[in-house]
Amino acid sequence: MGPTASGKTALALELAEKHNCEIISVDSALIYRGMDIGSAKPSAEELARGPHRLIDIRDPAESYSAADFRADALREIEQIISMGKTPVLVGGTMMYFKALLEGLSPLPSADEAIRAEIQAEADANGWEALHAQLREIDPVSAERIHPNDPQRLSRAIEVYRISGKSLTELTQTKSAPLPYDVVQFAIAPRERKVLHELIGQRFRIMLEQGFIDEVAQLKARGDLHLDLPSMRCVGYRQCWQYLDGEFDYDTMVEKAVAATRQLAKRQLTWLRSWPELNWLESGAEGNLVTLMRQCR
């Protein structure tokens, strides 16, 4: 695990090449076909060195949940183990890792009619009014969910309207945890400013590789929009808005880099509270040796 641009892929490839391992991607952007540059998807050369499972498994118009990931990952883990190999799960989508390790609550599926109803209420009265509703039905979730987070706010209210139970109540019951012994590692630079520099450098490389053209091709399909999970991935939203003329090129770069740094900050916040985690420093010599020693 680790924040974006921390060197997870390079270490995973080294591990796969030198030991009897197969890689499973744990990344909510890499699942989408046609989103290669902006998601920092491993190159063809890297995939030849170490194939990644759960990459390119969905169209950007499709949804993919943590429950979908857990089911897919469990199947891949079982298959890799049956081949006499060790699964290596690599990525930065902490919600996926958490779902896999701890199990998931039996939440109801999305209801498009109720979602539309909630959106109409938000359009009429504002998200603050809906947040007040959430405080009445689920004060614990209301403490965690900010009024400016419409996706999570809408989902919490939707769950209550479908089931008659609060999100807090339902999340207290979870499916069985992962039935395997897991050794967990996180990799990140020692200093945050180093990570920030790496993020900026990587985004500039993405632009040189043709990221704007990639987003333009996705936009030209006509069936994608900014409310889809795929198009909410960092970088894609900002580039889409630039192509829509909402701001100039320099502002797009600034906003995309800032959004990526915010993502890295959230990832690090998750990791700092993660139990039983072994830390590695990005770029440090001997990371693979340290990792293998901890796995014995």
Curated annotation (Swiss-Prot):
InterPro entries for the chain: Dimethylallyltransferase, IPT, P-loop_NTPase
Residues annotated for ATP binding in this entry: G2, P3, T4, A5, S6, G7, K8, T9
Cofactor dependence: Mg(2+)
Annotated site, Interaction with substrate tRNA, chain positions: T93, R115
Magnesium found in the keyword field: yes
UniProt cross-references to Gene3D superfamilies, sorted A to Z: 1.10.20.140, P-loop containing nucleotide triphosphate hydrolases
EC number, UniProt record: 2.5.1.75
Reaction(s) the record says it catalyses: adenosine(37) in tRNA + dimethylallyl diphosphate = N(6)-dimethylallyladenosine(37) in tRNA + diphosphate
Chain positions covered by the region annotation Interaction with substrate tRNA: 27-30, 151-155, 232-237
Keyword Nucleotide-binding tagged: yes
GO terms, molecular function: ATP binding; tRNA dimethylallyltransferase activity
Record key words, sorted: ATP-binding, Magnesium, Nucleotide-binding, Transferase, tRNA processing
GO biological process, one term: tRNA modification
Stretch forming the signal peptide: none
Binding site for substrate: T4, A5, S6, G7, K8, T9
HAMAP family: IPP_trans
Protein family according to the UniProt entry: Belongs to the IPP transferase family.
Quaternary state and interactors: Monomer.
Stated name of the protein: tRNA dimethylallyltransferase
Native source organism of the sequence: Shewanella sp. (strain MR-7)
